[in-house]
Amino acid sequence: MNIKKTFTLTTLIGFYCFSFLVTKTSARIGESRTTIQKRLFSSGGAEFREESSVNNKTRGMPYAKYEEFFPKSTEIRVYHKTTDGSHSKLSGSGWELHVLYVNGVSELEIYKKSQKITEFEMIYLLNFQSSASYWKKSQESESPAEEPSAFGFDFIRDDEKVKAKKLGGNSFMVYSTELDRGFAEAMLADLKALAPQSVEGF
């Protein structure tokens, strides 16, 4: 995969819009679980299957607070991949990948690294999700009231179908705009319904 080597993330985020050279037109968000796992496992990745391990790793994740609003067909899978592509033993340094599938299709992915994610790795992660489009950096001038958002975002794809957000220095989240909006609207409706009872008696 060719990437403009003269660009660094520091340079890129200084512009409102930026694009990447891509060789694949299929994005990860929107892919089936079968496709994602085939690619991941062929690169040495493995899946956490023990329920206690999965529960421990999903606790406190951004998507966890919206669990009550998950569609019935939702599955959460957690994977581990080494940085050098060697066979994962589900421990040690490397990456954790959290994927929220709805009807067997990826709608949210969190990439969590045991060390800080480098600017070059972040470029690749965004590049993987470009789908022949390009990414725009979030602007403070954008009104958050324009559309409900559960997670907010640091980047949005030009077709507005996918958003991305940095989660500290070692994690990065990518998710569909539809899922983000759906969680936000469900939460707002729930809060609205609870408000009368909450203030009753004042």
Regions found by a protein language model. Name each.
Residues 10, 18, 26, 163, ...:
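Residue-level detector of intrinsically disordered, flexible termini
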Residues 2, 16-132, 198-202:
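Short helix/turn-capping signatures at newly exposed starts of structured segments
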Residues 105-202:
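Non-cytosolic coordination micro-motifs
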